Amino acid sequence: MENTLSALRSLMASHSPPLDALVVPSEDYHQSEYVSARDKRREFVSGFSGSAGLALITKDVALLWTDGRYFLQAEQQLSDEWKLMRIGEDPAVDTWMADNLLKEASIGVDPWCISIDTAQRWERSFAEKQQKLVQTTKNLVDEVWADRPPAEINAVVVQPLKFAGRSVADKLKDLRKKLVQEQARGIIFTSLDEVAWLYNIRGNDVAYCPVVHAFAIVTSNSAFLYVDKRKVSAEVKSHLEENGIEIREYTAVSFDVALLATDELDTTSTAKDTLAEITKQAEKFVSETNKSVNGKHQAKENSNNLIWADPGSCCYAVYSKLNPDTVLLQQSPLALAKALKNPVELEGLKQAHIRDGAAVVQYLVWLDKQMQDIFGASGYFSEGNTVKKEELSQSLKLTEVTVSDKLEGFRASKKHFRGLSFPTISSVGPNGAVIHYSPKAETCAELDPDKIYLFDSGAQYLDGTTDITRTVHFGKPSAHEKACYTAVLKGHIALGNAVFPNGTNGHALDILARIPLWKNGLDYRHGTGHGIGSYLNVHEGPHLISFKPRNVPLQSSMTVTDEPGYYEDGAFGIRLENVLIINEADTKFNFGDKGYLSFEHITWAPYQTKLIDLNLLTPDEINWLNSYHSRCRDILQPHLDDAAENEWLKKATEPVGV
């Protein structure tokens, strides 16, 4: 790590202009949350492997910013050369740079790895001291990363209409209506899931996310896909061409954005067809325009139409090639269109979650038996003390990794399975307090029947993406552990039962999940709910349920998770998570003619009643729990062929408090 920092500082000093600081974001050229191995630049320089964070390297310090989900993980992974900066507690990165760097300091960043919003916010922070945000002509981390993984050539595939629910033609038609409404003659898409959704394609370029590295440009009469053509089969080419989509090389996007800015994008010729020619043109253009953030191509004076770019997801390199006076900086219309699931997508999600729930039950049945047979645990249902066995003859060592591999195996046996939707969080005892803990085979813990076990996992199926968290104990939980679990469950129930008017933002509902914890002086450092894709990203916007405000109303046909938690450092973690669909509510009245909304659970797996202190639940909460368990049993039993599994599920969903 020390050698890496030294090498970067040497490049910073020799850069033109010399750099006083270098920013290394987590994101790739598409502002992705999850990135491919070759794009994990921040992880390479810092050693921190969390999905969110930003590294800043100056001449004499190295700092890492991350949010509350990763405080513990960052403390464990950062070496002595690095200082952890806690988002929400320490100064924001732009504030720190403005306050601590010298007047007229030059701060370098790869403009492809930073959003328009972020870059402009930083420029405002730097203005008082005349500090400059400098676009590096090359990514400096790539220059020192000797064994950087090579780019993979993964095939693009068509997402069939029977799963997508809407044709590309219909999606393009709706999109072009939006362009007319906003007086825009073109729009640029850089988010991988938006490109995949719009063109009904999927890929395998990013682990856990069925997307392909690609850009898209759509105008009033043309559509382009920028992708490594080696990934495109004859079938995919035919699918795209039938929908009027021209395929161009991935690296051509830089050149074509500049042509779009000056209204010279050639919408008829496909002569620029070779990778070598496109790369040469793109590199020439980048070298001319990336010298500073002020290098912009101006649109023609007689052009009154706008170019639409999403400031939150579009990279600054793209914006730097446009005339700022003719750019419409507004959220992508696809963000909301993708979040509003069509009937086929909703049905697919429901079916995927049923199969996924069956896999989770099979896993719990297997794990319960292993814990009893190997460790002498009292098991999932009983609260007796663990009877330690003198000799443990384990054919399979029960570690956080080996048991999560077993869970993946159960999922892999299900119809339409294509992989996991994120790295499984399989955590025992104190590891559960690391909110996004990712176990490694070399260092992970063994399961312990006397400690809480939390698993947060999900899968990618052709008809939907899943995400579920359950927390269990195979021994005798303490009264404190029960009280904490019950508080989390109460918040989970309260949010899932909410009825609210149209126009309500997720921020307004977040408190419902936290109140039972707050009453006990407890809380959690993460959001409560996120959207989920339809065989796409497991984290999907634009809506959220969070303590952080976001002005995006919840709407009917959106999906959102319900996942409160509680984490006690050095002891345990508790989280419960279901995926919900937002529906129109059938209310007795309709005050203000607003219309009201409610949630529908589509995740099916039992809550461990042994961990619940029933004295802390209200009669209504007990009724809800029993009703959910009854439906869970009815829905999952047809998908369990083994009699022992059915018997286990029946016992796990027996009514309580009656």
From Swiss-Prot:
It comes from the Eukaryota. It catalyses: Release of any N-terminal amino acid, including proline, that is linked to proline, even from a dipeptide or tripeptide. Expressed at similar levels in shoot apical meristems (SAM), root meristems (RM), root apical meristems (RAM), roots and leaves and, to a slightly lesser degree, in root nodules. A peptide binds at R69, H436, H530, H539, E563. One of its GO terms (molecular function) is metal ion binding. Mn(2+) 1 binds at D456, D467, E577. One of its GO terms (biological process) is response to symbiotic bacterium. The keyword Endoplasmic reticulum applies. It is found in: Nucleus; Cytoplasm; Cell membrane; Microsome membrane. Gene3D superfamilies: Creatinase/methionine aminopeptidase superfamily, Creatinase/prolidase N-terminal domain. Its EC number is 3.4.11.9. CDD domains: APP. One of its GO terms (cellular component) is nucleus. Disruption phenotype: Increased root nodules number in the presence of M.loti probably due to a slight up-regulation of nodulins expression (e.g. NF-YA1). Keywords: Aminopeptidase, Cell membrane, Cytoplasm, Endoplasmic reticulum, Hydrolase, Manganese, Membrane, Metal-binding, Metalloprotease, Microsome, Nodulation, Nucleus, Protease, Zinc. It is a peripheral membrane protein. Catalyzes the removal of a penultimate prolyl residue from the N-termini of peptides, such as Arg-Pro-Pro. Aminopeptidase that binds to the auxin transport inhibitor N-1-naphthylphthalamic acid (NPA). May play a negative role in the regulation of PIN auxin transport proteins. Involved in the coordination of the symbiotic nodule developmental program; prevents the formation of root nodules by regulating the expression of the nuclear transcription factor Y subunit (NF-YA1), a key nodulin. Belongs to the peptidase M24B family. This is Aminopeptidase P1.
